């Protein structure tokens, strides 16, 4: 098990790497300069998607045994999406700990692995925005709209994008 100091060192390194070599599509930094385990992330809505032009804020919370266990990611901006719970928590395979999948939706290779970094997590979230998974939704209503009433879904996402721009 990773000690908090190992987790701190790894998070410090990942933060330094992201500051030195920023990645298109998002920015990340500490929520509070004294706590390496809480990050503030802004994801820019990916081009050629319904989320294009949006600026979506999230908090990434790391456990003390990171990277052995995954962080949680919760949008603080409103995001209407099949894979985002009503409280903003992101539901994607790589954030699920290894082990049994009671619903049988995921391969073990799709779940959390200590090789993932802040960058790979956020890039997976950007990919999720581009390609919703409506097979195992966190937000059943959004998934139903995505499948059955795409125009209504698009209107709600447009409203989220507009609100995210107004918050700048």
Per-segment meaning from a language model:
Residues 39, 56-58, 71, 123:
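Hydrophobic residues positioned within well-ordered beta-strands of beta-sheet architectures
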Residues 42, 59-61, 74, 93:
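Residue-level recognition of well-ordered beta-strand positions that form the cores
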Residues 2, 19-56, 64-66:
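N-terminal onset of structured domains
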Residues 45, 62-64, 77, 96:
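Non-catalytic surface loops within mature trypsin-like serine protease
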Residues 2-22, 70-168:
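Domain-scale recognition of soluble eukaryotic interaction modules
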């Amino acid at each position: 098990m990773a000690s908090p100091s190992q987790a701190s060192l790894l998070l410090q390194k990942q933060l330094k790497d992201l500051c030195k070599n920023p990645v298109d599509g998002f920015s990340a930094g500490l929520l509070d300069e004294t706590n390496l385990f809480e990050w503030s992330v802004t994801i820019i809505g990916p081009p050629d998607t319904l989320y294009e032009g949006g600026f979506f804020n999230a908090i990434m919370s790391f456990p003390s045994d990171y990277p052995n266990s995954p962080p949680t990611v919760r949008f603080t901006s409103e995001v209407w999406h099949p894979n985002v719970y009503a409280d903003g928590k992101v539901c994607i395979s790589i954030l699920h700990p290894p082990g049994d999948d009671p619903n049988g939706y995921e391969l073990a290779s799709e779940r959390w692995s200590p090789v993932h970094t802040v960058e790979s997590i956020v890039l997976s979230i950007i990919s999720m925005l581009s390609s919703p998974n409506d097979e195992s939704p966190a937000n059943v209503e959004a998934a139903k709209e995505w499948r059955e009433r795409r125009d209504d879904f698009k209107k709600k996402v447009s409203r989220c994008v507009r609100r995210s721009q107004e918050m700048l």
